[in-house]
Amino acid sequence: MDKYKNLTRSLTREFINLNPIQRGGILPKEAKKAVYEYWDGYSVCDYCHGRLDEVTCPPIKDFLEDIAKFLNMDCARPTHGAREGKFIVMHAICKEGDYVVLDKNAHYTSYVAAERAKLNVAEVGYEEEYPTYKINLEGYKEVIDNLEDKGKNVGLILLTHVDGEYGNLNDAKKVGKIAKEKGIPFLLNCAYTVGRMPVNGKEVKADFIVASGHKSMAASAPCGILAFSEEFSDKITKTSEKFPVKEIEMLGCTSRGLPIVTLMASFPHVVERVKKWDEELKKTRYVVDELEKIGFKQLGIKPKEHDLIKFETPVLDEIAKKDKRRGFFFYDELKKRGIGGIRAGVTKEIKMSVYGLEWEQVEYVVNAIKEIVESCK
């Protein structure tokens, strides 16, 4: 049993963490203070009257109203993450056998959520494959038309705002316009955008937005947000016949503990940091420009419109063939320099993000990688 005692994290706090799924989830000091107050089990339920979204101490009810305004949506509910939000929407508004039309870069959880809800999936393909993997957004019309011509019902349109593979930002307005023309509900998966960059739900004509607290809103896992328009409120918030105060799709209550507290405590920090998105893009583009000088090749759309970067790295792969550490040399060399978050043993392609780092740290990372390549050649 000793292995469960005194747990520590091997990626220490002193390391610069480049993992794209973690850069947006780093807690500010305000949230760390809240952890101490609320780390016990059902601590948010001290003054609960039956439903999480109506709790006023801590101010969960106010927070959900504020987050809805922040996203320019009508309503919001806490979830355990974006994946749970997607399933809630699919289960609440679609009928078994309906089709979900989604982009080819959609996260695996979009497919799994549809499968769990007993729905079918139709993909919208690429305008271009390698190296940009840009989605053909106008292709949504064609896919929907083809399905309808075959007598199939499309219950939901889903667009991945930014995908987790290439970091491509999709023009949600285009798909929102198509959704309105077709009269089909539109879900925007903002796991990589809400909390990192500005998102305006009504501007892009989204009926639903799902967000990830732990991925992009400086919160502890698992937590997220489902924001939705008033038009679909009755379906999303339908209550149980036997337990009338409990919302069915939320199974009564969702993120009922420390994660939602960190989400709230980080909210003022998040509101301010999205205003600095242009500066984050400058850092990202600087990294791309500098590392392409030494043989890296950025995959995905150029110039970068999001902080998640995927590189082809043939120069690292060539070094790995000669180095006795093989593919682990790059991870080892980064670790020596206080840098983590890059997958160990992988040298053909890497993903990274410098979101939220100071310029001095960004320059340090770039110079460290250049030094590694030069010294290990």
Curated annotation (Swiss-Prot):
Listed A to Z, the keywords are: Protein biosynthesis, Pyridoxal phosphate, Transferase
Modified residue annotations for N6-(pyridoxal phosphate)lysine: K215
Question: Which cysteine pairs are covalently linked by disulfides here?
Answer: none
Q: Which residues does the record give as pyridoxal 5'-phosphate binding sites? A: A82, R83, N189, S212, G213, H214
The signal peptide, as residue positions, is: none
* Entry superkingdom: Archaea
One GO BP annotation is: translation
| Known catalytic reactions | O-phospho-L-seryl-tRNA(Cys) + hydrogen sulfide + H(+) = L-cysteinyl-tRNA(Cys) + phosphate
Keyword Transferase (UniProt): yes
EC number in record: 2.5.1.73
| CDD domains attached to this UniProt entry | SepCysS
**Principal EC category:** transferase
Cofactor entry: pyridoxal 5'-phosphate
> Which is one GO molecular function term here?
Sep-tRNA:Cys-tRNA synthase activity
What PANTHER family is this protein classified in?
CYSTEINE DESULFURASE, O-PHOSPHO-L-SERYL-TRNA:CYS-TRNA SYNTHASE
Q: What does this protein do?
A: Converts O-phospho-L-seryl-tRNA(Cys) (Sep-tRNA(Cys)) to L-cysteinyl-tRNA(Cys) (Cys-tRNA(Cys)).
Q: Which HAMAP family match?
A: Sep_Cys_tRNA_synth (MF_01675)
The family assignment reads:
Belongs to the SepCysS family.
User: What binding partners and quaternary form does the record give?
Assistant: Homodimer. Interacts with SepRS.
Q: What is this protein called?
A: O-phospho-L-seryl-tRNA:Cys-tRNA synthase
